[in-house]
């Protein structure tokens, strides 16, 4: 229809009328620029807003680097954040899920990008999310160099959103993990988790539903916090302590990030075919949240171990002669470390449990 024959009083449709507010997106970008600047590190000192993020690998000081990449999300933990209207911690989870997967390969996280998709963009909600992402990047020592904010009416309900993260790191070629000398008798150390982290939340939400509690209810397992606040405790980022321990002593042979699938699905991923991890379950100090979930949902111990981290967010396989040095290096960085078991010859399963989990 030409301008000449358009009916009088009829206005053309706009993108905003279709549900996409470009001005809101631009406002959010301006608000997050200081957050992005706070994550600068050697190799990344540019501004966001270009068509791509830049990183100078030479400035990061590597000599013979291998790039390592990972991407992940936060899963249905986001549903709790949305329903509880708490959005400033899930960004930490997003970074943690990616960078913890880098450090288990011996890599130092260098930069991070995020993808934030929503039905209707709220700049304040978006800024809260990015503030968490920036905090996660600072904890991991990586730069937030870009991202994508997608307002998609019709794809998501107003207020709903999803997140995805992308991290790239680097390791010197001769420092990659797992090492090839993992042997029977090597010691298994466990690093404490901060809580549920970012896996198993479909089961968590079902258990909360059965309990009859709401997200604003007092958390039965954490005095002084609501259930939403307690369950949204951010995933622990292990990057700086593990890199410090790797660099301080040549003792860590392998690392495993305990995510979905728990011990039985994650530990064997870093082990040679002929070896298994023997885990002393009574050595694990199980946080109260897991005991509450198990009892309230009547969840069997083996199901707990295959769904949740149960208090151990990271596993390290260590040279027996270096165990004390590794524990000291990790403790100096604030990590709670427990000796969990040892490597043994594999007969069937990649993980062998000894004793019972104290749920």
Swiss-Prot record:
Alphabetical GO biological process terms: 'de novo' IMP biosynthetic process; adenine biosynthetic process
Cellular localization per UniProt: Cytoplasm
Keywords (A to Z) from UniProt: ATP-binding, Cytoplasm, Ligase, Nucleotide-binding, Purine biosynthesis
Predominant location category: cytoplasm
One GO MF term attached to the UniProt entry: ATP binding
Catalytic activity: 2-formamido-N(1)-(5-O-phospho-beta-D-ribosyl)acetamidine + ATP = 5-amino-1-(5-phospho-beta-D-ribosyl)imidazole + ADP + phosphate + H(+)
Pathway info: Purine metabolism; IMP biosynthesis via de novo pathway; 5-amino-1-(5-phospho-D-ribosyl)imidazole from N(2)-formyl-N(1)-(5-phospho-D-ribosyl)glycinamide: step 2/2
Superkingdom as given in the UniProt entry: Bacteria
Cited SUPFAM superfamilies: PurM C-terminal domain-like, PurM N-terminal domain-like
Pfam families named in the record: AIRS, AIRS_C
Cellular component GO terms held in the UniProt record: cytosol
EC number, UniProt record: 6.3.3.1
Family indicated by similarity: Belongs to the AIR synthase family.
Annotated protein name in UniProt: Phosphoribosylformylglycinamidine cyclo-ligase
Native organism: Brucella canis (strain ATCC 23365 / NCTC 10854 / RM-666)
